[in-house]
Regions:
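Hydrophobic alpha-helical segments typical of transmembrane helices
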Residues: 29-32, 41, 92, 112-115, ...
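C-terminal long alpha-helix characteristic of the crotonase
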Residues: 7-12, 54, 63-110, 114-117, ...
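CoA-thioester-processing core
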Residues: 1-47, 59-60, 75-79
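Terminal peptide-recognition signature
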Residues: 33, 57, 93, 132
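Short acidic-aromatic low-complexity motifs
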Residues: 48-50, 126-127
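Short, basic/aromatic-enriched C-terminal tail that caps enzymatic domains
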Residues: 128-145
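Acidic, divalent-metal-coordinating active-site segment for phosphoryl/phosphodiester hydrolysis
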Residues: 50-56
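Generic structural signal for alpha-helix termini and adjacent loop/cap motifs
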Residues: 122-123, 135
Length: 145
């Protein structure tokens, strides 16, 4: 649960069975699940210890996508490669989203505005804009600088 995206094979099963052992989900299990899927569903899963199949996990936001079992790893790897080729602004986006969650909205918006300005100081902004003008969206090869 401590990743940006979670992919599952269609036969995957998830759960927080610790309550059935008389303990609670440790290592962040209560907090991460709640932040991912909301408190009502997280309570249901944590209180019951029941298993969640892949299709339900997708429906409640526990996973980002479900693929055929044999196709899951290649799909996840391709997604990771795609993000790794992305612009420096991806770093700003992740930081602002994660840090902003802990801030009041007005402060989070200031953080976003600062990061927006920082994007204009990157090589990737120049590359992205020129590529858009020359070739349309989604064609740039970024340097992550």
């Amino acid at each position: 649960m401590a990743t940006d995206f979670r992919f599952a094979g269609e036969s995957a099963v998830f759960g927080q069975p610790e309550v059935l052992l008389g303990i609670l989900p440790g290592a962040g299990g209560t907090q991460r699940l709640t932040r991912l899927i909301g408190i009502t569903k997280a309570k249901e899963i944590n209180y019951s210890g029941r298993q969640v199949k892949a299709d339900e996990a997708l429906q409640i936001g526990l996973v980002s996508a479900v693929f055929a079992d044999d196709d899951c790893y290649p799909q996840a790897l391709e997604a990771a490669k795609s993000y790794a080729r992305g612009p420096k602004s991806l770093q700003f986006i992740k930081r602002v989203m994660m840090d902003g969650l802990a801030l009041p909205l007005d402060e989070a918006l200031k953080l976003e505005a600062e990061a927006f300005g920082d994007c204009f100081e990157t090589e990737d902004r120049l590359i992205g804009v020129q590529s858009f003008l020359d070739h349309g969206p989604g064609k740039a090869t970024f340097t992550r600088k």
